[in-house]
């Protein structure tokens, strides 16, 4: 994958997250902001999830209260380089814990 393909795929990931949060109808307040290639999800309790892109490595990084995760694209899924879990699974687990209610991005 070249840099422009990486950015296209990361932009697509950001857009999907933003769209899902735009349609969020849960009880808690969840905000999403993109600034300089960094996507920040802020929860009602003040906690945050930070998602950013690491262009030199062609990775997406996810920082949550539970820890940090690095994802490589394998096929059409972003996969954690340590646990083998998908980006969506780990994001949903973290968002659910930080929101205090079930959050789904799919």
Curated annotation (Swiss-Prot):
Gene name as annotated: cyaY
GO annotations of cellular component type: cytosol
CDD domains: Frataxin
Function, as annotated: Involved in iron-sulfur (Fe-S) cluster assembly. May act as a regulator of Fe-S biogenesis.
Protein name: Iron-sulfur cluster assembly protein CyaY
Family, per entry: Belongs to the frataxin family.
PANTHER family the UniProt entry points to: FRATAXIN, FRATAXIN, MITOCHONDRIAL
Molecular function GO terms recorded: ferric iron binding; ferrous iron binding
Annotated keywords: Iron, Metal-binding
Keyword field contains DNA-binding: no
Domain of life: Bacteria
GO biological process: iron-sulfur cluster assembly
Gene3D superfamilies: Frataxin/CyaY
């Amino acid at each position: 994958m070249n840099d422009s393909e990486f950015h296209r795929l990361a932009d697509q990931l950001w857009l999907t997250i933003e769209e899902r949060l735009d349609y969020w109808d849960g009880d808690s307040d969840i905000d999403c902001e993109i600034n300089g290639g960094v996507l920040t999800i802020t929860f009602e309790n003040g906690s945050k999830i930070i998602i950013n892109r690491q262009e030199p490595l062609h990775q997406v990084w996810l920082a949550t209260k539970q820890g940090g995760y690095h994802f490589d694209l394998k096929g059409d899924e972003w996969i954690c380089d340590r646990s083998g879990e998908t980006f969506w699974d780990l994001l949903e687990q973290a968002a659910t814990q930080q929101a205090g209610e079930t959050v789904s991005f799919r």
